[in-house]
Design a protein with these regions (language model features):
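Hydrophobic alpha-helical core bundles mediating ligand binding, dimerization, or RNAP-core interactions
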Residues: 22, 29, 33, 109, ...
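Short, contiguous alpha-helical
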Residues: 1-30, 37-40, 45-90, 126-158
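Acidic/histidine-rich alpha-helical segments that form the ligand environment
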Residues: 92-126, 130-142
Length: 158
């Protein structure tokens, strides 16, 4: 039987992976300057409003979706209720954004990310696999969308 991981070691690793994904690249899996917020800082509202491909979402929709996902996760964990949601709403309703709307979306994402970090800070134990996978999921989910955004930028900026 494997030795259990101490909660503080797991939490520290989660914070490191979150930081790499959202803010500060350590080279664990991203290249320098490619975290989510570093990437978003290079995108104008006009670029964020362009659908990449015929039926594809805009980058603005990608950002709103990630914030929506993080907020939903935090609410569900805090309340203990998995509320039903319309996963398609953000994709249907988000397209062209003004500069002000784009900046507000990025700020909302930052707020959502900070709420997730507070939730993790409030977690003193990782009692089962569901808690652990639920903590890893936002890293994986956000990394997926970061990849989508970075691939779209190859089309939009080149």
């Amino acid at each position: 039987m494997a030795a259990p991981i101490q909660a503080e070691h797991f939490t520290s690793a989660i914070y490191t992976l979150l930081d790499e994904t959202f803010d500060n690249v350590y080279g664990l899996y991203l290249d320098k300057g490619t975290s989510l917020f570093e990437t978003l800082a290079t995108i104008s509202a006009e670029e964020a409003s362009i659908p990449v491909g015929g039926q594809c979402a805009t980058l603005a929709a990608q950002v709103k979706h990630v914030a929506f996902y993080l907020d939903l996760l935090v609410r569900n964990v805090r309340s203990g209720v998995n509320e039903p949601v319309d996963w398609g709403k953000v994709w249907r309703e988000t397209s062209v954004v003004t500069t002000e709307e784009w900046e507000a979306s990025k700020a909302q994402l930052r707020d959502s990310y900070n709420r997730l970090k507070r939730l993790i800070a409030d977690t003193t134990a990782w009692p089962n696999e569901d808690h652990i996978s639920g903590t890893i999921a936002p890293i994986v989910h956000t990394a997926y969308h970061l990849g989508e955004i970075r691939q779209a930028l190859c089309t939009l900026k080149h």
